[in-house]
């Protein structure tokens, strides 16, 4: 018998597009459902609240949708976030939540890890939004490099979407002794046109999550959203490069050796994927390779990290020195 088994849940669902309150309601229902099935952790996809801005891959700008998106994005210090925290606490389950964060009407692709006590353990932002995402979202600061927290059942962290192609960012995350990793993605197309890289398809993105599992030796919760015909009509993505056909749901779980340990849900369907994680498997894989431990060479190769918050207004060094000298006088 394994010493430690952790039951996890990965959602595959469609948000209520551009509707903060309705998506909060749906989130609480899914949290409660996962907890009722004895899950200790439930994962939600990238920008689950209020949904991914899919139209950015169809046209350069949409003023009306962008304004609605800003208004319906989630603030960290808000009654809506407090409600989600209370829901996690009442259900007794940890929650990894991807959301569009509104900070003074600037947006960020963000994630919070909420413990079963309802407290926020990690709040991070995507370090660099990908390609067209930069028309909507800003960059993270250095403090968001701390992305893993200890929960009662293990160490949990997350990255968003194509952060999984960033070798240095991945390595920084792995050094935090992660055991369970949430890979948060938007709806993913099974097929795309020749002009779109294969790495942006559902299979390409699953490959990135699976590679992270092998590199890190962690369990990876690959979490995606669904977009329906109604969602396509609401967001005006029909005929666009991505997220223009119903589907997008490819949620699954990978073991630390890279094997898929869950069955797929049909990509147009909503549901929750569950798995019981045998945490002894982490030890078996670390025996073979530990890229931040016995299988590393820090005498030859190492990573430098700055975790500072860089404020937009800060004194010049000369002014700081002058202030110090004035005090001495």
UniProtKB/Swiss-Prot annotation:
UniProt similarity note: Belongs to the carbon-nitrogen hydrolase superfamily. Nitrilase family.
Domain annotation CN hydrolase: ranges: 6-279
Domain of life: Eukaryota
EC number: 3.5.5.1, 3.5.5.5
Active-site residues, record numbering mapped to chain: 46 (proton acceptor), 126, 161 (nucleophile)
Organism of origin: Hypocrea virens (strain Gv29-8 / FGSC 10586)
Catalytic activity: a nitrile + 2 H2O = a carboxylate + NH4(+); 4-chlorophenylacetonitrile + 2 H2O = 4-chlorophenylacetate + NH4(+)
Keyword terms, alphabetized: Hydrolase
Protein's recorded name: Arylacetonitrilase
InterPro entries: C-N_Hydrolase, C-N_Hydrolase_sf, Nitrilases_CHs
Enzyme class: hydrolase
